[in-house]
């Protein structure tokens, strides 16, 4: 990793149906091997199911799910005098969003429903209602940070 220049931020085009940049990032994270149309089909299909089940705007359910999954604090390893400490640090906004997206997708892929569309819709609904594996992951992260609060003075 070069120390001279940080990578330029690429402009992300909002998705066609809802005009949301975060949703495009979500689709890009779901995408395998450059198959964007498949990723779009999965996300829009899941949004249709969410709309039918929750009787709510799917983009609002999506945003609520992301907010409920995004961690506020995490632990990072810090080596001090031969010992490695897990130091709690606040999470930057971009990383919060990236982690929330990653955890939602991992939790959806880990479910036992038939299709990815069903799995994703179920995980989105669960996360919006503060349930599910993605929310559990965030709570575990917060618990870890709370347990290591004694080392917070090693923050950098």
Curated annotation (Swiss-Prot):
What functional role does this protein have? One of the primary rRNA binding proteins, it binds directly to 16S rRNA where it nucleates assembly of the head domain of the 30S subunit. Is located at the subunit interface close to the decoding center, probably blocks exit of the E-site tRNA.
Q: Which residue spans adopt a coiled-coil conformation according to this UniProt entry?
A: none
**Tell me, how does this one assemble?**
Part of the 30S ribosomal subunit. Contacts proteins S9 and S11.
Where does it sit, as one GO cellular component term? small ribosomal subunit
> Residues of the signal sequence?
none
The Gene Ontology terms for molecular function here are:
rRNA binding; structural constituent of ribosome; tRNA binding
Q: Which PANTHER family match?
A: RIBOSOMAL PROTEIN S7 (PTHR11205)
Q: Does the keyword Nucleotide-binding apply?
A: no
Q: Which UniProt keywords apply?
A: Ribonucleoprotein, Ribosomal protein, RNA-binding, rRNA-binding, tRNA-binding
The protein here is known as Small ribosomal subunit protein uS7
Q: Which CDD domains match?
A: uS7_Bacteria
Record GO biological process:
translation
Q: Which family does it belong to?
A: Belongs to the universal ribosomal protein uS7 family.
